[in-house]
Curated annotation (Swiss-Prot):
Keyword Transcription: yes
HAMAP family attached to this UniProt entry: RNApol_bact_RpoA
Origin: domain of life: Bacteria
CDD domains: RNAP_alpha_NTD
Protein's job: DNA-dependent RNA polymerase catalyzes the transcription of DNA into RNA using the four ribonucleoside triphosphates as substrates.
Disulfide bonds: none
Protein name: DNA-directed RNA polymerase subunit alpha
Additional notes on this entry: Able to replace the endogenous E.coli protein.
Residue span of region Alpha C-terminal domain (alpha-CTD): 248-336
Lineage of the organism: Bacteria, Pseudomonadati, Pseudomonadota, Alphaproteobacteria, Hyphomicrobiales
The keyword Hydrolase appears for this protein: no
Region described as Alpha N-terminal domain (alpha-NTD): spans on this chain: 1-232
GO biological process, one term: DNA-templated transcription
Length: 336
């Protein structure tokens, strides 16, 4: 069966997120098949840094400034430094259309991202970020163009041919994810000691949580990889269909050693080669009492346990035992 290629690989039964504020989070996923920690960690990291959409300033116009190599009277930073500071403004914006936002301030004092006047669907996430410093009597007015996008776009690609004089294009850092690191360690699952444990640390600008960022990255990978799947998935039976096909109570597939029986009773059943409840209920009381070392006390104990399950000795199960009893027992173990 082709589906065993992926169905029999172990999947993490422990996926935990620990958040430190809105900007930092740690993911722990274990166990993974050996080698999958590195495979998934590296793939998620690359997608997180390159492919998630965010908002950034794409251009700025400063009153009285014609190009980025100018200086502004009364402003301590030159325009080049101001542009570098503008690149670090963290923004969350809804919609895909370009938006404008403005800042106007008089000195003395510091101009921060929190001084920017925004429209309703734009949020400044780092309002204390310094843009420039004004001396006494100085005044500055800046108008920013904001867009949504992904990855890194250099200033040259943000320069339009019909741009007005004085509009300075800015390198756009759209990615909401600022840092990602991961490590892979050994972990244990049952008797296997060399499964992988993946730990990822994510830092964002606050426009998206670390947990959501990983979910988006995983969805991107899922969507990209789906084009390589050249076959239809085998259809899974619904629980109702599966139960209908089974000609007997799924509880009969439960092993008798899972019942809470005394050691004496359990040993007697084992010695009589009674493995499943389906084997047990087809025995009569007389047959059970002929079992070596099996007495009336053990019989009453078993009758009580079966009664609690709606079963009794001496029942007839025409299709018992099924040919694939072990597979059926695994398939229906959550139904008894």
């Amino acid at each position: 069966m082709i589906q065993k290629n992926w169905q029999e690989l172990i999947k993490p039964n422990k996926v935990e997120f620990a958040s430190s504020g809105r900007t930092k989070a740690t993911l722990v996923a274990e166990p993974l098949e050996r080698g999958f920690g590195l495979t998934l960690g590296n793939a998620l990291r690359r997608v997180l840094l390159s492919s998630l959409r965010g908002a950034a300033v794409t251009a700025v116009q400063i009153d009285g400034v014609l190009h980025e190599f100018s200086s502004i009277p009364g402003v301590r930073e030159d325009v080049t430094d101001i542009v570098l500071n503008i690149k670090e403004i963290a923004i969350k914006m809804d919609g895909d259309d370009a938006k404008r936002m403005v800042v106007r301030k008089q000195g003395p004092g510091v101009v921060t991202a929190g001084d920017i006047q925004t429209v309703g669907d734009i949020e400044i996430l780092n309002p204390n970020h310094v843009i420039c410093t004004l001396d006494e009597g100085a005044e500055i007015r800046m108008e920013f163009t904001v867009n949504n996008g992904k990855g890194y776009v250099p200033a040259d690609r943000n320069r339009s041919e019909d741009a007005p004089i004085g509009l300075i294009p800015v390198d756009s850092l759209y990615s909401p994810v600022k840092k990602v690191s991961y490590k892979v360690e050994n972990t244990r699952e049952g008797q296997v000691l060399d499964y992988d444990k993946l730990t990822m640390s994510i830092e964002t600008d606050g426009s998206v949580t670390g947990e959501d960022a990983i979910a988006f990255a995983a969805r991107i990978l899922q969507d990209q990889l789906s084009v390589f799947v050249n076959f239809d998935e085998p259809q899974k039976e619904t629980e109702e269909e599966a139960v209908t096909e089974l000609a007997f109570n799924p509880a009969l597939l439960k092993k008798v050693d899972e019942l809470e029986l005394s050691v004496r009773s359990a040993n007697c059943l084992k010695n009589d080669n009674i493995v499943y409840i389906g084997d047990l209920i087809q025995k009569t009381e007389a047959e059970m009492l002929r079992t070596p070392n099996f007495g009336r006390k053990s019989l009453n104990e078993i009758k009580e346990v079966l009664a609690s399950m709606g079963l009794h000795l001496g029942m007839e199960v025409p299709s018992w035992p099924p040919e694939n009893i072990e597979d059926l027992a695994k398939r229906y173990e959550d139904q008894y």
